[in-house]
């Protein structure tokens, strides 16, 4: 109910009705009052005119009694006529009840003295009681000299008339006026409602449009064709709606781009407001925050508080377990609506970079050592032969064998470095051919038969000789050579090394499994990284460069396949190679 009363249509309609009703009431009151006054004045003027004529008739008549009787015949019923010579000496014996009361009014009302003494016309309303009811009459006294008396200058012609006819006329006029006002008010009500609805229709359309705009719907644009202020308001609102839509679209696009950029960042991003609440975060930040410990959280909170105090950019390193982060906090003047400030936290995972840097350092140290050792041996044994220190043929032969072995070792190290450099510069190319896998595995069997016997290892090859794979013979030879060499380093006499073939619907699978020392879990994710070495697990043979498994991974991926490792410390390691089947 209250919502309807608050409607502009109802308010405008009620306003029009109130104004029209007020005007009609005032006009009706004025009209009724005027008509009452008009008819009363007309009646009074008519009575006065009758009194003047009777006075003139009686004055000019020779037979005054006949003139009076004639006048009474004309005036009486419904009115009455009295001609009084002396108000103080009148007989009431032959008068009717009404005339007696009229005469009593004339005698007792001092206003009528002006008729006899001053010759003025006097009019009064007189209430007469007759037969238990009251009736109002108009009584007019008019001076005349038709019958002089010794007590007064003038005689008086008194005419009275019943006002009931005037009251009936006034009542009829009042009823007609009220009925007319009601009819006019009814018509005005309907017209006012129609007019207010018509006038406010554009406003209601604008209200609906404003509601839709507040809900995010900018497609509704009502057409208001009027040339008045409402039409101008509609045009301005439509233009404003279009501009708002454009701005919202621009903001949405900007927000989507910003969110996409933030979510695609490799750094974790957090937005912190003055209440120290997170108002913005990307997936990387969520992952980091879910996995950090309480000490790291305390570290972040301290840095955030320091940034709020200094209002400067802070950059600090955070080490947590085996991971390394760089935390950057920047103060922002306005990060929320209302001009509230905050801090943007950027957490970058530098673990890979740190490990890579560490591996480079280790690589330089290892390569320096690996190069220095064979070079020192080459120099030492050759100097011994040249200087004649070693003269026995068997000793010379043994020294030359050591020189040859160290030369091969140095050559292998240099080749690995050159291969990696060539891969970085030119990329890796493979020439795949559809050929039996047995050709590769037979080659490996022959190559490592003697080495397995020397090391006391049980090396087995299980494969289907008729099965064909799509691979590059030379590249896969390089891969298996590296993996079998590594397996021999991880094992001890009596352990097993098994090379097994398998397949699924889309891939050919090769397993290289050993029962050696295994690899610790913290190293598994990094064994294929460049320069990475698990030195603690190496128990036999010469030191490597940390590039072998990295090269293996590049070769397998260039084949369109994948290489993975599973290991359990103390129980052994399995490398799994998957290559796409020939088309």
Curated annotation (Swiss-Prot):
Every Histidine kinase domain range: 366-583
Modified residues (Phosphohistidine): 369
Keyword rRNA processing annotated: no
Residue ranges that the UniProt entry lists as topological domain Extracellular: 33-174
Cytoplasmic topological domain residue ranges: 1-11, 196-583
Gene: srrB
InterPro entries linked: HAMP_dom (IPR003660), HATPase_C_sf (IPR036890), His_kinase_dom (IPR005467), HisK_dim/P_dom (IPR003661), HisK_dim/P_sf (IPR036097), HisK_sensor (IPR041328), Light-responsive_reg (IPR052545), Sig_transdc_His_kin-like_C (IPR004358)
Ranges of residues in domain HAMP: 197-249
Lineage: Bacteria, Bacillati, Bacillota, Bacilli, Bacillales
Protein name: Sensor protein SrrB
Membrane disposition: Multi-pass membrane protein
Signals that turn on the gene: Activated by SrrA. Expression is maximal during the postexponential phase of growth, particularly under microaerobic conditions.
Membrane-spanning parts: 12-32, 175-195
Protein origin, superkingdom: Bacteria
Gene Ontology terms, MF aspect: ATP binding; phosphorelay response regulator activity; phosphorelay sensor kinase activity; protein kinase activator activity
């Amino acid at each position: 109910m209250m919502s309807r009363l608050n409607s502009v249509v109802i308010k405008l309609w009620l306003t029009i009705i109130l104004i029209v009703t007020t005007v009609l009431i005032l006009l009706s009151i004025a009209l009724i009052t005027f008509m009452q006054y008009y008819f009363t004045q007309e009646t009074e003027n008519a009575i006065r005119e009758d009194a003047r004529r009777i006075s003139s008739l009686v004055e000019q008549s020779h037979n005054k009694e006949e003139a009076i009787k004639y006048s009474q015949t004309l005036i009486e019923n419904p009115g009455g006529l009295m001609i009084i010579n002396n108000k103080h000496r009148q007989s009431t014996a032959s008068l009717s009840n009404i005339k007696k009361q009229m005469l009593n009014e004339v005698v007792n009302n001092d206003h009528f003295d002006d008729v006899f003494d001053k010759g003025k016309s006097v009019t009064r309303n007189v209430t007469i009681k007759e037969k238990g009811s009251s009736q109002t009459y108009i009584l007019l006294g008019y001076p005349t000299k038709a019958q002089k008396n010794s007590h007064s200058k003038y005689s008086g012609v008194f005419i009275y008339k019943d006002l009931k006819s005037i009251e009936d006329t006034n009542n009829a006029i009042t009823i007609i006026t009220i009925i007319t006002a009601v009819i006019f008010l009814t018509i005005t009500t309907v017209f006012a409602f129609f007019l207010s609805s018509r006038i406010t229709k554009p406003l209601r359309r604008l209200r609906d449009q404003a509601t839709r705009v507040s809900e995010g719907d900018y497609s509704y644009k009502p057409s208001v064709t009027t040339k008045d202020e409402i039409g101008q308001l509609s045009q301005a609102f439509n233009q404003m709606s279009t501009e708002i839509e454009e701005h919202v679209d621009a903001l949405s696009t900007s927000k989507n781009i910003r969110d996409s950029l933030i979510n695609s960042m490799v750094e974790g991003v957090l937005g912190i407001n003055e209440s120290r609440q997170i108002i913005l975060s990307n997936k990387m930040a969520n992952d980091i925050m879910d996995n950090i410990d309480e000490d790291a959280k305390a570290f972040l909170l301290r840095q955030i508080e320091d940034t709020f105090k200094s209002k400067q950019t802070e950059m600090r390193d955070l080490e947590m377990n085996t991971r390394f982060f760089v935390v950057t906090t920047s103060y922002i003047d306005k990060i929320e609506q209302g001009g509230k400030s905050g801090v943007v936290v950027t957490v970058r995972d530098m673990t890979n970079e740190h490990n890579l840097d560490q591996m480079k350092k280790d690589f330089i140290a290892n390569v320096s050592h690996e190069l220095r050792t064979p070079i020192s041996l080459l120099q030492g044994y050759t100097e011994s032969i040249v200087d004649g220190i070693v003269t026995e043929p068997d000793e010379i032969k043994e020294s030359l064998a050591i020189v040859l072995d160290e030369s091969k070792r140095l050559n292998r190290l240099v080749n690995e470095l050159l291969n990696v450099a060539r891969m970085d510069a030119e990329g890796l190319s493979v020439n795949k051919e559809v050929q039996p896998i047995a050709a590769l595995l037979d080659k490996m069997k022959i190559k490592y038969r003697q080495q397995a016997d020397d090391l006391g290892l049980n090396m087995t090859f299980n494969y289907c000789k008729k099965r064909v794979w799509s691979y590059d013979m030379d590249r896969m030879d390089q891969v298996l050579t590296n993996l079998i060499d590594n397996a021999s380093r991880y094992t001890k006499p009596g352990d097993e090394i098994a090379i097994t073939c398998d397949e699924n619907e889309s891939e050919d699978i090769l397993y290289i499994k050993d029962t050696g020392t295994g690899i610790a879990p913290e190293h598994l994710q990094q064994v294929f990284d460049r320069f990475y070495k698990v030195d603690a697990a190496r128990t036999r043979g010469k030191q490597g460069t940390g590039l072998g498994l990295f090269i293996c991974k590049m070769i397998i991926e260039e084949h369109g396949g994948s290489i993975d490792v599973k290991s359990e410390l103390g129980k052994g390691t399995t490398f799994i190679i998957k290559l796409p089947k020939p088309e």
